[in-house]
Amino acid sequence: YVALFYLVVKNNETMAQIGLIVLGAAFCLILDGGVIELLVKPLAERLRPINDPSLKQLLDIVPGTYENSFSFFSAHAANTFSIAIFFSLLIKNRLFTSFILLWSFVNCYTRLYLGVHFPSDVLVGLLYGGCIGAAVYILYNKVCKKLLFKKSFFSTQYTATGYAISDIEMVLIVMCLIILYTIFRGILCFV
């Protein structure tokens, strides 16, 4: 998240623009986490795979993994995917979109691997998060049009929305390092 914040600060001219993007990202997380944790999970009351007595013996649980709340549906999947969709629509760069979606999917995979969610929890989280990310971007776009924030760039060094390719590459390096760290930690669990 820090790398995304850096990208926003470095590539927007006014505090109003930066604030609106940060507010949009925060709105994604609040809508995801708030609705899921305060409304859906308590109503669904679905046990996590690692807490389900009928499944617990079938799972190879990673030591130190323990979750006390309910499973349906995955807030991690919804949060990361809503942020991925919001920033993909905001930045409009194919390589960035590919990496931020990969980051979200790796996060989702960890939820399955650790046994804290069923596949359906993750799929519903992705669907919900995608809808939230797109809806928040549409709202962000409408507010930008009212406030007359208009950027249009035609250069090989910038995206169509004015984000410097060099800054995007820095964020991609951070995402690659996070993904490599996740893979490395997964391998260490087997050693």
What are these regions (language model features)?
Residues 51-52, 58-60:
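Glycine/small-residue-rich loop that forms an oxyanion/phosphate-binding "nest" at active or ligand-binding sites
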Residues 6, 26, 30, 57, ...:
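Transmembrane helix-bundle signature of multi-pass membrane transporters/permeases
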Residues 1-11, 80-88:
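Hydrophobic, aromatic-rich transmembrane alpha-helices
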Residues 1, 35-36, 83, 132:
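Hydrophobic/aromatic residues in alpha-helical transmembrane segments
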Residues 60-190:
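Membrane-embedded catalytic cores of phosphoryl/pyrophosphoryl-handling enzymes
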Residues 8-9, 44, 112-113:
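Hydrophobic residues in alpha-helical segments
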Residues 5-36, 97:
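Interfacial segments of alpha-helical transmembrane regions
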Residues 29-50:
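Transmembrane alpha-helix/helix-exit interface in multi-pass inner-membrane proteins
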